[in-house]
Swiss-Prot record:
<keyword id="KW-0066">ATP synthesis</keyword>
<dbReference type="InterPro" id="IPR020546">
    <property type="entry name" value="ATP_synth_F1_dsu/esu_N"/>
</dbReference>
<keyword id="KW-0375">Hydrogen ion transport</keyword>
<dbReference type="GO" id="GO:0046933">
    <property type="term" value="F:proton-transporting ATP synthase activity, rotational mechanism"/>
</dbReference>
<protein>
    <recommendedName>
        <fullName>ATP synthase epsilon chain</fullName>
    </recommendedName>
</protein>
<dbReference type="InterPro" id="IPR001469">
    <property type="entry name" value="ATP_synth_F1_dsu/esu"/>
</dbReference>
<dbReference type="GO" id="GO:0045259">
    <property type="term" value="C:proton-transporting ATP synthase complex"/>
</dbReference>
<dbReference type="InterPro" id="IPR036771">
    <property type="entry name" value="ATPsynth_dsu/esu_N"/>
</dbReference>
<dbReference type="Pfam" id="PF02823">
    <property type="entry name" value="ATP-synt_DE_N"/>
</dbReference>
<dbReference type="GO" id="GO:0005524">
    <property type="term" value="F:ATP binding"/>
</dbReference>
<keyword id="KW-0406">Ion transport</keyword>
<keyword id="KW-1003">Cell membrane</keyword>
<comment type="subunit">
    <text>F-type ATPases have 2 components, CF(1) - the catalytic core - and CF(0) - the membrane proton channel. CF(1) has five subunits: alpha(3), beta(3), gamma(1), delta(1), epsilon(1). CF(0) has three main subunits: a, b and c.</text>
</comment>
<comment type="similarity">
    <text>Belongs to the ATPase epsilon chain family.</text>
</comment>
<keyword id="KW-0139">CF(1)</keyword>
<keyword id="KW-0472">Membrane</keyword>
<keyword id="KW-0813">Transport</keyword>
Amino acid sequence: MAAELHVELVAADRQVWSGEATLVVARTTSGDIGVMPGHQPLLGVLESGPVTIRTSDGETVVAAVHGGFISFADNKLSLLAEIAELADEIDAQRAERELERAKAEGDATAERRADVRLRAVSAR
């Protein structure tokens, strides 16, 4: 079993993160899944939620992911997201304002998106 896996986190408009990791945790339609080197091949649908990547050097990278697909084979993990942003890129105060506005307007999609962004920030 290899000690690390290659991870590509890609949004529709850009490559968000790429590198070597020892563990990736993501939310799928079947529930949360942890992928480590040597994992069985998989293909799944991503739910909106934070994705946590434990890099090979022990750092933790967290991203807010909004829908997409996850694919793993031969120690290569691809996370193809409709929207994705690293927690370090998220302005928490702006996300709080967006959450409050979405709640006031009854916009469930915007509320879910702001909530995921805030959870990613708090997980970093």
